[in-house]
């Protein structure tokens, strides 16, 4: 029983570490996108936003991905492009 608990705790710690790494990657990408947008002319920003939104619109829904997840992704991309980090 102790081995089972120890193994579960170890797996939980691994998952937490993976989660931290993913969060760091997302934060880094947000910083990069924000910096790029801030250094672009307004018309170039809008062109990029339109292209990204167009690409998202054209993506075919995947039955294996829940609609809520797809909508969450779309909302987050829009938020990032229209209101980058301060």
UniProtKB/Swiss-Prot annotation:
Single GO molecular function: anti-sigma factor antagonist activity
Protein localization: Cytoplasm
Coiled coil: 1-36
Record key words, sorted: Coiled coil, Cytoplasm, Stress response
GO biological process: cellular response to phosphate starvation; negative regulation of protein catabolic process
Induction and repression of expression: By phosphate and nitrogen starvation, and in stationary phase, via the alarmone ppGpp.
Originating species: Escherichia coli (strain K12)
Transmembrane segments: none
Keyword Coiled coil: yes
The family this protein is said to belong to: Belongs to the IraP family.
GO cellular component, one term: cytoplasm
Protein name listed in UniProt: Anti-adapter protein IraP
Matches recorded under InterPro entries: SigmaS_Anti-adapt_IraP
Quaternary data: Interacts with RssB.
């Amino acid at each position: 029983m102790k081995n089972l608990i120890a193994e579960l705790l170890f797996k939980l710690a691994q998952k937490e570490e993976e989660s931290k790494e993913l969060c760091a990657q997302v934060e880094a990408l947000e910083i990069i996108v924000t910096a790029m947008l801030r250094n672009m002319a307004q018309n170039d920003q809008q062109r990029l936003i339109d292209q990204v939104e167009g690409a998202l619109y054209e993506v075919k829904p995947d039955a294996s991905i829940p609609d809520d997840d797809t909508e969450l992704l779309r909302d987050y991309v829009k938020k990032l492009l229209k209101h980058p980090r301060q």
